[in-house]
Amino acid sequence: MAKFKQAGAIIVRNGKTGPRILLVTARRNPDNWIFPKGHVESGETLKAAAVREAREEAGIEGKVVGAAGRMSFEFGDNAYRVTYFVVRTTGEGKEREGRRLRWLKYKQALRRLTYEETRDLLRDAWPRIKVFAATRASGSRKKK
């Protein structure tokens, strides 16, 4: 069995009533809702790959603000280990690669995510995600 390393992004932004989480549909099965993820290119860090996947799959420019967790799965004859990061953005995103996008509250995202392993990842990371989503970008200040 071939083994592959991937990176993924749990994309968050602040909404009027709290953090919103971006889900995308899977390219191979548009009924499956997931977090953007994919291969790590040669010489690329996991964090850089997560940011690139957010851009490629969701049209999001963002910044890694923390670790979210790891998940392993098998697909066909391959084994994958995905390292997820929380990527914070202020953007809306843009549907790309034939994928749909949805900004959801935490409980809505749990219901929409297709795979139990991904729901577990979100549950485990949620306390950190709330903190990361609320943290202002370094160097930015509120106007008085």
Predicted regions and their residues:
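N-terminal strand-loop-strand
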Residues: 1-35
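Structural detector for helix-capping/boundary residues
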Residues: 7, 38, 52, 104-107
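Active-site-adjacent beta-strand/loop module that shapes the phosphate/pyrophosphate-binding cleft
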Residues: 4, 63, 70-98, 102-107, ...
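The catalytic Nudix box helix
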Residues: 35-68
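Nudix hydrolase/Nudix homology domain
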Residues: 28-33, 94-144
